[in-house]
Structure formats: structure tokens, C-alpha cells
């Protein structure tokens, strides 16, 4: 009885013999009954071939008996060690894909799996399902974003999902752990892999077949497989192709859950090679074609270089001749190119603060990093850019007014790169303050907007009457009004400007400017005048006060919209809603209404009915004597005298006698406004 009890106790404490399994394949027999094949998997010449050139196909091979993976008493996962030699053999002139997986599966067959990026392991619906009970190590040669693959040549540990729990680029570490040497999975070479699992740690190591196993694993991670594997599982390999194809092959395989040195018995040398041979360049069919093409390209390149050199020299000579006159005549000093290049950090794109039709504008520092400037670099390939450069030098170079951007200097590089250097305007362009939603920008108040419009009017008056010659700006718009540190407006961009004698007729016939700001007569005849500048200024007034661009998709043109509001007695509804929420707007609401009326008058379609810029400035100044002296026409004097004494509501004037105002009424009311709080003289430039 004691002997029987002893034998029973011994049986319970000793490992169950059915839990131990060892097998080794140094090649596979065609008639082997130890491996079950599924899909397109075959055994050829003692090599287990999982896939071939068939597109969108799956091949799977499993050991034909289940393997106990859990201890029958403790239910803990049994350790195991497996090693195999595989190759991904590419086909000539075919892109290779997709990959191979060593796996534990609860059942045989390939049902529930898809080809291509799913590697014959899962499909679109069951990927990531805990009920899969699949553990695998993938060798993947395609980076699938949906699975968060790290690259197109990686090894990953998969648990019920193709989203690897741990992955790394395929390769191995040097024994000192300092140098990582990548291995290309699908280059046709034979690779040996070692996968060990014990004490809840998975180690994956790989190396070129025939070489010593690296000391440091490629992958090593803690992993509890208790909820993943079942008591008994099938073990083997699966691979798949898609539009990309290659042959996934297993040349040798060992597995044990008791002997971790069994892999030493694998034959790793003398194995067939599947690396594609390299064709001789001379024998290649495309060699002659490429050689002829190269010769042709060389000849063409030499011809183009010679043509470019000759053309550049002729262009340089032409431009040099063109520039000689004004270079000697105009005072703005020439700044060395090296200083400008250094100040803009080599025209770094990070310093771009604006882009115009003929070039970019960069922020820079001159005079040892002390002076902030804006550098306008005009395209050397543009004839318009050349004309713009000469125009700005010859006009803006000699103009001096507090409401015009100051030109500090210019630069003309020999190769034809033209630059204009201006004072830097810290607060950028006016349209940025009107239209951009920027936390750093506060909404301009009504009083600030009127002050800015007053300054712009002063600058335009100086151009028309205050200088030795008459200057037509021809491109007045919100983006060409810059604001300095003190929010003083400065009119900029004189690239379209033209200079004429005060008594000289204007001979422009070319339509230039910006859509929405062009006066009707410019569109019809191409002729610019001081009145076309007045028209553009009127549109600017409406734009600034209403917070709307001249032309917006799906909306009426700005001028027509404001005119309609005025006819209905609702002109105040046209004011910018953001501006109406600013502090103090009610105190200047009458002035805002009159400025809108002034804008409408300036933008009248009949140039003869528009005021001059002198009249506009005098409206802002409120100097009655100057208004009177500025006009000689008897009818103009009569309406000015009549309206200067009127302090009644403008709405009474507009709508007291008729339902629709006339342009003469607009002219009378607008030009009789007295804004007495604005008393600084702006008729002289300074």
C-alpha cells in the first residue's frame, strides 16, 4: 500500500510526458505526413514553399498534431524554443511582397484569413478580436498605415492582431550592443530566426543563416500568453501575396518545449541561394537606349548652357544700359548686396512677410543688426519687375511725406537681382487689421479707422499736388497701406506709379491696378488720372468702414451695397459689426456716417462728380476757409456756403425732401462736414 502511494505521488510531481515535444526538419519530404499544407503551400525539392507567383493568395503549413501549450495542473504557459531558416525569394522584374508569420493557432485551415497586408493571418473583420487566440511573429516587407507598421522591413510580435505589440527594423545587434546592422528581408538571402519563450518573456533573434547567433535579441519583451493560447495549439507558418508577389520558403525548422538547444542540430550551410543574379550592364536590353539617351542629353545640355550664357550676357548688357541713367540721377543710396543678403539670412523663407506680383518681401536687419527694414526682391526674369524697380526708384526715391513709406536704398546685383529697401512697418498692412482673425490683433475702433483714412488721404494729396511733379499711384488698396509702430498709415508699393508734370496730359493706355478698385473709365480707356486714384480711395474708405472687401463671392459689390443702404436710409447698417462693438463708437457715429458718404462720393462712376483729394483732405480738416478758397466755380461756392452753416442731421438732409438722394446732395453733404476734432494740417508733406 505504501509503495502504491509513493508511485502515485511521484506521478503527480513529475512533468506530464505528453507535455514534452521535440521535432526537427532539415528539409521536408514530399510525402511527409508531419506537416499539413493549406492554400497554395507546397513542398518542392525538400523546401516548404508557402507562396509562389500567384497574386492575392495565402499559403499555410502547420505541424500535423497539436502541441500542449499549458501545464495540465497549473495551467501556466509552457516554455518553448523554435528556430527556422526562411527566405523571401523575389521574382525578376516583379515588386516583392508581403511577408511571413510564425504562429500558434487554435485550428487548422485558412478560413478567417485574407491575403496581401493581412499576411494570411487575419481578415478585415476579425483583426484585433481576442477570441482569435493567435500568437505570431511577423516578418513584414510592407508598411501598412492601418496597422501602424514602423517601416517596410520589420519584425513584430502579434497577439490576436496585426497591430504588433512590439516591433523593430529587421537586423541584429553587435555583441557589445552598440552597433545595429539591418537585414533586408526580401533580398533572397537565407535567414535563421530563434524564438524563445519562458518566464513570461519573448525573445526574437535573427541572423544570416550559417552565422553565429547574436547574443542580444532583436526583440525582447514581457508577455503573458495565458489568455492568448489555449491548452493545445497548432504551430507553423503562414504567408501571403497581394499585387506584390514573392516566394516565401522554409528550409529548416526545429521546435521544442523542453530542449532549448535543439536548434543547434539544424543544418545552416550548403543551402540553396535565392538571390537574383545581376545582369551584365552591357548585355542589358536597355543599355544601348540609355547610352544614346545620355549622349543626346549631354549634347542638349551643352547647347542649352551655351544659349543661356549668350542670352544672359545680352540681357545683362541690355539691363546695364537701361539702368545707367537713373543710377546716376536719383539720390537713394545703393546698399551692398552682401549686407542685404546677410541681413535677411540669405533670403530665408522664414523671413518672408509678403508676396507681390513681381517678387517677395523679406524682413531684415541692416547696420549691424540695429535697423529693421523690409526688402522687396523683384524677380529678375520679369520685364514688369524691371519697370516696377525703375518706377519705385524714380518716384518713391525722392518723395518725402509722413504718410508715405520711406525708401532707404536699393541694390542691383550684376546678375540681375533687384532689391528695394524700405523702413520696416511693425504693424503690417491695413487689410490684416480689418480682415484677419488673429488673437494678437485687436479690432480697430471707429476713431482709429477714420484717423487712418485721413492719413492716407494726406499722402495721396501730396502725390497729386504737393511734389514738384504729379504722381499717380494707380494701386491704392488696403494691402498697400502699411501701419508703423504708432499706427500711422503709410502708403506703399509704387510699382505701378507714374510721374507727370502738373500741366502735362496723362498718356497711360494700359489697364493696371487691382480688381474692385479700378475706376470705370480705366477699364474702358486704360487712362489713369488723379480722379482714378480718388475712386480707389473711395473704395478703400468703404472697405475700411464696412469691414468688407470690394468684391466678395456671392455678394453684391461693396459700393452698390452701401449705395442701396443709403437709399433706404440704413447707411449705418453698413458699418463693420466688429467696429460697432468697440468702445466709444457712439461718440463718433455721425462722423462715421459722413465718412461713408464721402467714400460713396469719391467712388462715383462719373469722374467729373468726384471731389479732388484736396477737397477730401479739407473735409477731414474741417477748415471752411480753405474749402472756400479752394473752389472758384460759382455753383460750388453757393452749395458750400449753404451747407457749412448747417449742423442738422445728415439723415434729415438725405431724406427730408425726396425718397432717393441725388449725387449733388451727396456731394453737398459730404464736402460740408466739419470734423473739428481733427485740426492738424496735412496739406504739406513731412
Curated annotation (Swiss-Prot):
Glycans are attached at residues 29, 34, 52, 64, 111, 123, 168, 203, 224, 259. It is found in: Cell membrane. ATP binds at residues 353-361, 376. Keywords: ATP-binding, Cell membrane, Glycoprotein, Kinase, Lectin, Membrane, Nucleotide-binding, Receptor, Serine/threonine-protein kinase, Signal, Transferase, Transmembrane, Transmembrane helix. Gene3D superfamilies: 2.60.120.200, Phosphorylase Kinase, domain 1, Transferase(Phosphotransferase) domain 1. The active site is at 475 (proton acceptor). It is a single-pass type I membrane protein. Residues 347-628 form the Protein kinase domain. Residues 1-20 form the signal peptide. Its main location: membrane. In the C-terminal section; belongs to the protein kinase superfamily. Ser/Thr protein kinase family. In the N-terminal section; belongs to the leguminous lectin family. PANTHER family: PTHR27007. This is L-type lectin-domain containing receptor kinase VII.1. It comes from Arabidopsis thaliana.
